[in-house]
């Protein structure tokens, strides 16, 4: 009980700060302060003083929400400060706050992508907001192309490591507070403990995920390059969110659904509708893994063997500025 109270206090201090009224990533903006203000509004809208877990549903995986207990009208995320409308296929700016296996869980029905013309800070704003609201565990799901020929359509793969080939980072230019290091250790970016929990729930593979900037698909030469670099999967999302979450001390689980063969001898022309269809068919399997992992978490949403880290990097005064609508 004492540990739970202490961990909640670590995140409860994220409740006040003055922030600029510019969008995340804009000159002069403090994205951490903006996340705190959005978290306060999230608490007001949901009636939940804190959240333990964040689950982000990728392309075509919105059906997993039903299997995770989402019901009733979702929250309109665009009504939260600095949340932009998702425009990717199969993504909706909606969320549900649910009790999942005894943990208060925020389920988000999509995400922003860099290819939508958004800054890295805008892309990771939902993740930072959930962590400011108390989430210690972040589950990121996505659809991906198979670089490794051993993978089959519909497979659920736990992300073991990643290649960030976007040429950018959500930490660039934003980390000036001494509470958190600018140079974050990414050795265990994808929690080994959470991956072990996922494998205990279902027989799933692990793999290395490469993020390309998109929106164009990869060329055969690029896929050969990715294979040579050790990638098993390729997609256009997820890595910035993982970086941002690790920077703030949260534990991250990544689950990728193989929705197509990447460019090469096995691949035909990609039909986005087909990607959504394949992902949708794997939604129950993804939900099963997520629910099983969350069931094994302690009451504050962190695995029992998780590392306890310093408080997230935020700065600002004690007075809160009214957020723009």
Predicted regions span which residues?
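Metabolite-binding pocket within alpha/beta catalytic cores that recognizes anionic/polar moieties
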Residues: 2-186
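His/Asp/Glu-rich mid-to-C-terminal helical/loop segments that flank catalytic regions of hydrolases
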Residues: 263-312
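Histidine/lysine/aspartate-rich catalytic loop segments that bind and position anionic ligands
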Residues: 162-216
């Amino acid at each position: 009980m004492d540990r739970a109270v202490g961990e909640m206090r670590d995140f409860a201090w994220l409740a006040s700060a003055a922030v600029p009224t510019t969008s995340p990533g804009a000159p002069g903006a403090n994205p951490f302060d903006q996340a705190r203000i959005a978290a306060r509004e999230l608490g007001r809208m949901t009636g939940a003083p804190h959240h333990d877990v964040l689950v982000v549903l990728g392309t075509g995986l919105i059906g997993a929400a039903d299997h995770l207990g989402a019901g009733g009208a979702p929250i309109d995320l665009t009504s939260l400060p600095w949340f932009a409308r998702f425009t990717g296929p199969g993504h909706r700016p909606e969320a549900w706050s649910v009790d999942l296996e005894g943990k208060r869980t925020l389920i988000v029905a999509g995400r922003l992508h860099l290819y939508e013309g958004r800054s890295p800070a805008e892309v990771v704003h939902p993740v930072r907001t959930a962590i400011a609201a108390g989430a210690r565990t972040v589950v990121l799901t996505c659809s991906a192309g198979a670089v490794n020929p051993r993978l089959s359509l519909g497979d659920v793969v736990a992300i073991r490591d990643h290649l960030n080939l976007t040429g950018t980072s959500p930490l660039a230019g934003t980390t000036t507070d001494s509470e958190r290091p600018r140079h974050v250790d990414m050795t265990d970016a994808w929690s080994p403990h959470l991956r072990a929990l996922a494998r205990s729930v279902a027989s799933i593979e692990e793999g290395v995920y490469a993020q390309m900037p998109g929106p164009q698909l990869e060329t055969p030469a690029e896929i050969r390059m990715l294979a040579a670099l050790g990638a098993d999967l390729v997609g256009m999302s997820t890595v910035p969110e993982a970086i941002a979450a690790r920077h703030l001390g949260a534990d991250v689980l990544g689950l990728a659904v193989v929705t197509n063969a990447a460019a090469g001898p096995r691949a035909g022309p990609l039909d986005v509708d087909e990607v959504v269809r394949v992902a949708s068919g794997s939604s129950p399997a993804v939900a099963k893994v997520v629910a099983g992992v969350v069931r094994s978490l302690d009451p504050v949403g962190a695995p029992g063997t998780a590392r306890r880290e310093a408080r997230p990097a935020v700065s600002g005064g004690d007075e809160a500025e009214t957020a723009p609508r």
